[in-house]
Each structure stands twice: as C-alpha cells, then as structure tokens.
C-alpha cells in the first residue's frame, strides 16, 4: 500500500512484511515510447541488433571461457545433463526449435521442444538429469509457468530464458538467462525472438564448454559469428526495406500465404506465418518444405504467394537443392515465389519472382536476418 508518507508491503493474507526483499529495475521509461517510429513493431524490429548485442554482453571472460554469472546451477549438474526439454508458447517455441538444431549439433545430447500447454498433460519423462528450458518474453506466460512447476516437481532443473526481470518464471526457476532486449510493447514479438535465440545459443555453447563437447577454438569461432549478428541484421534492415515494400504493395490483396523452409528455416517459416496471422489477419500456413508434396501443394493456386526460406548452398548442397526443387514445383503451378536467400544465389534468382537477400554466414547463424525479412513487411502493418 502506498500513501503520502510511507509504503507498506503485505502478503496476500494481509500480514505486513517487515523487511521485504528489494531489487532495482534497470528500465528507462523512454524505452516504452515510439521514439518517432510509426508503430512499436517497426521500432522494435529496428532494435533487433541492439537486443542481440546486449544479450551477448559480458558473456566471455578474460580467460576465454563463457561466463554465465547469473546461472545458479552448479557446473557439476550441467555436466550430468543428458537431455534438454524446451517449454514455450508461440514465438518463444519457434525460438526453441531454432536452438534445438544448434544445441544438438554442438552438445550432442537430445533436445525436445514442447508447447508448454501440452507438456504437463502428456506425462513427460523427466529425471534429475533433464534440463528444462522455459522460454518466455514476459516471464508471466501461465502455460509455461505451470509446465515448469510440473518439471520441478519431477526433480528436473529448470533454466528460464526471459526478458523481464523479477517475473514469475525466472523467480520460480533454478537459473535464468536474461535477454536484455528491452520492453516489447507490440503484440507481435520481434526483437525478443532474436534475443531468445541468442541466449539459447549461448546456453548451448556453455554446455558444450562444461561437457568438453567442443574445443575452445570452435566455441570462440561460434561466438565470433554470434557477435557479428548485430552488424548483419542491420545490413538487412538498411538494404532490403525497399524490396520488401515493393513486394508487399504487389501482394496486398492476397487472401492467403504459404511459408516453407527446411532445417532451421522450418521454424523460421512457422514464425513468419505467425506474424502475418497476428498482424495482417491473413490466412497463412507454415510448413516444413519437405511436406509440400504430402498435402500443402494442393493449396497452391495461380498467383498464390509462397515464401521460401532458402538455406545457403555452401556446405549444404543437398539441403539447398531440395528447397530449389520445391520452388520449381510450386512455380509450375503458377505460384508467386518470394525467396529469402543468401546473397548472389544464382538458382534463387532464376526461379523466384522476388528475393530478399541476406549476408553470407554459417547455416546455424542464418536465421536472424531471415527473421527480419519475415517480420519487417507492410503486410504486417495495420491499415
């Protein structure tokens, strides 16, 4: 209770708390203002580079090792982890799906991604050696909160990836990685998505470090790629906006869209589809590109916009060729092809009607600026 001369803290039963715990909220009220942008979503998309940069800040110690000071789980417990289960909803779940590919590749332990609202109703297999990672921007997602409580009851450690200090999910978890993305006011998550992927990647590299699954120079190389993300995201925002505007103007009357991707491009396709559903109220479906011939191709009509998340050809020739084959299939049905691809990909230029380019990078690092193109579009602007 706040009065003119004092503040009284009580519990839910009305009992006064004599010495309540306090903490400082590191938050600037101006961060919740538009600051000259037309919308909060537009502003927050452009804050993506800074969100990634802040999430990485201070993670590398002087000795060259990853340093996660805020993680309150003993290193011995991390070494014993033999399975990871990510629990989340919506955009956070897609961030977890992206991270699954990287963590399994780096740490060589299985990673499951569960929708939090389904998790506790299916009798999941949990042990003290299972690490449950709860991802939530707000830290108050009730489905995720209930799921993490269930996991702790079963004896598993829970680590939260969260953007809001002092929220319920980080408070009730065994450990927390804060994303430091700043307030996200828009309904549709943007900068929090890339910050969540960044934090999950840092967690994966830390696990690889404590388990000895990667050499130090390999971890350093992956971290260097992560540190380069803000610059490359900014490149996309600076160079591709007009192409997106022009394409959106041409497709503004489209009644439905398909988003397709493979590997880490699959969850990004799902996230891109979610953005159009949330903001443009347009019927949009995201699929794994390999599922195209198993049903979704029946939805493709003349002029239907189909967005392909194209992996780089370098080192992923088979994956790249499969996606190009999918583009050819829907092109034969008269679809309008929008491709998100690496710079100067000649196969994409040959078949796509419009291309949103991204800089060259390793496959596991290519989803940040792909997200930019899926999110930063007048299709998602309110009329």
Region locations from a protein language model:
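A SIS-like phosphosugar-recognition module
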Residues: 1-383
């Amino acid at each position: 209770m706040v009065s003119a001369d004092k503040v009284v803290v009580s519990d839910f039963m009305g009992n006064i708390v004599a010495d309540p715990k306090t903490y400082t909220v590191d938050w600037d009220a101006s961060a919740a203002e538009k600051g000259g942008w037309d919308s909060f979503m537009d502003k927050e998309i452009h804050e993506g580079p800074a969100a990634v940069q802040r999430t990485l800040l201070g993670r590398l110690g002087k000795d060259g090792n990853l340093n996660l000071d805020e993680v309150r789980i003993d290193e011995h417990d991390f070494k014993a982890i033999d399975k990871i289960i990510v629990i989340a909803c919506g955009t956070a779940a897609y961030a977890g799906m992206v991270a699954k590919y990287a963590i399994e590749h780096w740490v060589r332990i299985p990673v499951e991604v569960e929708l939090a609202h389904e998790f506790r109703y299916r009798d999941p297999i949990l042990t003290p050696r299972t690490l449950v990672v709860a991802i939530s921007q707000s830290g108050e997602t009730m489905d995720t909160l209930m799921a993490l409580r269930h996991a702790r009851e079963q004896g598993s450690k829970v680590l939260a990836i969260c953007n809001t200090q002092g929220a319920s999910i980080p408070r009730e978890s065994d450990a927390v990685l804060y994303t430091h993305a700043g307030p996200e006011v828009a309904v549709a998550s943007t900068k929090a998505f890339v910050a969540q992927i960044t934090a999950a990647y840092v967690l994966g590299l830390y696990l690889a470090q404590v388990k000895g699954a990667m050499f130090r120079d390999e971890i350093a190389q992956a971290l260097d790629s992560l540190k380069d993300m803000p610059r490359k995201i900014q490149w996309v925002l600076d160079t591709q906006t007009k192409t997106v505007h022009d394409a959106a103007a041409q497709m503004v009357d489209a009644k439905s869209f398909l988003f397709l991707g493979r590997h880490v491009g699959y969850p990004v396709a799902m996230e891109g589809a979610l953005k159009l559903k949330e903001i443009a109220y347009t019927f949009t479906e995201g699929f794994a590109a390999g599922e195209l011939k198993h049903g979704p191709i029946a939805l493709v009509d003349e002029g239907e916009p189909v967005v392909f998340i194209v992996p780089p050809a370098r080192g992923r020739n088979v994956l790249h060729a499969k996606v190009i084959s999918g583009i050819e299939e829907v092109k034969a049905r008269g679809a309008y092809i929008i491709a998100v691809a690496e710079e100067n990909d000649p196969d994409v230029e040959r078949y796509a009607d419009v291309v949103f380019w991204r800089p060259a990078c390793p496959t596991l690092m290519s989803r940040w600026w792909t997200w930019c193109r899926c999110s930063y579009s007048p299709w998602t602007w309110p009329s």
